[in-house]
Amino acid sequence: MDFKQLEKQYRDELLQNVIPFWLEKSQDKEYGGYFTCLDRQGNVFDTDKFIWLQAREVWLFSMLYNRVEKRQEWLDTAIQGAEFLKKYGHDGHLNWYFSLDQQGNPLVEPYNIFSYTFATMAFGQLSIATANQEYADIAKKTFDIILSKQENPKGKWSKAHPGTRSLKNFALPMILCNLALEIEPLLEPSFIEKAMEACIHEVMEVFLRPELGGIVVENVNTDGSLSDTFEGRHLNPGHAIEAMWFIMDLGKRLNRPELIEKAVQTTLTMLNYGWDKQYGGIYYFMDRKGCPPQQLEWDQKLWWVHIETLISLIKGYQLTGNKECLEWFEKVHNYTWQHFKDPKHREWWGYLNRQGEVLLDLKGGKWKGCFHVPRGLYQVWKTIEKLNVQE
């Protein structure tokens, strides 16, 4: 692969195609915040605002401002979204709602812990860009609330009957791996080291299962044992692979090459397991025993799964020189650019059927916003840049 050309391809796609799309199409100039329900051309088809996606867009533009270029336009975009979130996104005690209407009235109660994690990321990154102490405080206080909710993330909003089947889920420790590095500048060093070790332990010792051939499961019993239930058999290959680049970043930060190596091997294991050998692409959901999955969309091909996989593969190659990572990167790169990039209009499709045909031609919705595509393009660009410097 021509790394010089690839570096340019990812950088240009980010800065000339994807970012201008969100800058132009997503900002609500009337009420603040962002529209994320955007059709193929970028027209708004629903005005509700989802806290995950509002916060992710604040984070993304803050991150670009901090790491790529001090463009005022990017900072202004992040600040206006953050001010909307600060005013309307929570109940006054930093319990973050799931969704709001266009004006900022709450629609869905604060049942979802990931509203909190993305708010922490957003205000943490923006506080670095602005040196604004209020933003830093919001990030730190929200992070404290997340830690207090770790054992029971949904709290009073949980539908599960207490005590019958207590499962713990992979998503929170996985996100905390990323969050620990994201807001490290705001926290005490001794606390951060402990938090990092705890996350690594959960991801690599609890959810990664050597007895299943080294795959990562989404749910285990609270005592760490496997559960032979829909939830306990549930696999999400993209989630597991995304977590592995967080672990690689932690391995680099903590100078632990053996951890990086394990994350690389797990990436390859999950990719071999999750790749659709008939049509190409990575399955959305699987069942570890090969039973019929609960989710009807199990065989769809989703944008974020493939983009996160590209990040893990190129980081794995850059950090270890593993040739299998590079071979897979080429294969996943070709599939992703061929199937998800819209050849006529800006931004990428999110949802394909199993055969790789466009299922929904939207560019944003309730779950797809200004996050996985631009973050992925940025991460791959910067990793390939390192490879080019190494050469």
Where in the sequence are the language-model features?
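Glycan-recognition and catalytic cores of secretory/periplasmic carbohydrate-active enzymes
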Residues: M1-E391
